[in-house]
Amino acid sequence: MFISFEGCEGTGKTTHSSYLFEKLSKKYSCVLTKEPGGGLFNEVIRNILLHSYNKQIDFHTEALLFAADRAEHLSKLIIPALQQNKIVICDRYLDSTIAYQVYARGLSKDFVLNINNLALNYMPNITFYLDLDPKIGIQRVKQFRPKEINSFDLQKLSFHKKVRKGYLDLYQKDQQKRIFLIDASKSLEKIYNIIEQKLKEVFQIDL
């Protein structure tokens, strides 16, 4: 089973994916990972993409780096884990690329999907999209992880609004009902309960 967490900056993706991993690991064989990142090679790419000098990288180059990271991530970690019937929990996946590179950066959707062709064959069974006003999200970032601010955190509010629009469009056009929207302004406990209830309801996962 493949579970992903999506959302703009400061929505709690890392917090909730980590908590779910902790809960599920008590009863199931699980893997917690993230994008970009997830392996030695992936961490090198992550450092390039999230460093402040990323502002100088061409948007197509940036998208290709994300695609390279995902291809390596899939082949070395996600696919093997799924083949071993493990539950994979991923902090960001392909939806992030569409929201950020297509909606916010303005790249062609066809270009982005073509370079991420492998990922289209391994889409999550369920995606928890944590929705929040970008202004509040950035405030959270500055408050709770001031020493970990990356190149995307530094973008203008207008950029983050485009990202959110991208996510909302993906949610509204999701015919497979893969994406489950959660109001990220709710308390951590309420969000945990919503996630647990959805997994029990749809996949009969006992937490």
Swiss-Prot record:
Disulfide bonds: none annotated. GO terms for molecular function: ATP binding; dTMP kinase activity. Keywords: ATP-binding, Kinase, Nucleotide biosynthesis, Nucleotide-binding, Transferase. Pfam families: Thymidylate_kin. It catalyses: dTMP + ATP = dTDP + ADP. SUPFAM superfamilies: P-loop containing nucleoside triphosphate hydrolases. It is an enzyme of class 2 (transferase). The keyword Nucleotide-binding applies. InterPro entries: P-loop_NTPase, Thymidylate_kin-like_dom, Thymidylate_kin_CS, Thymidylate_kinase. One of its GO terms (cellular component) is cytosol. GO terms for biological process: dTDP biosynthetic process; dTTP biosynthetic process; dUDP biosynthetic process. Belongs to the thymidylate kinase family. Phosphorylation of dTMP to form dTDP in both de novo and salvage pathways of dTTP synthesis. This is Thymidylate kinase. It comes from Aster yellows witches'-broom phytoplasma (strain AYWB).
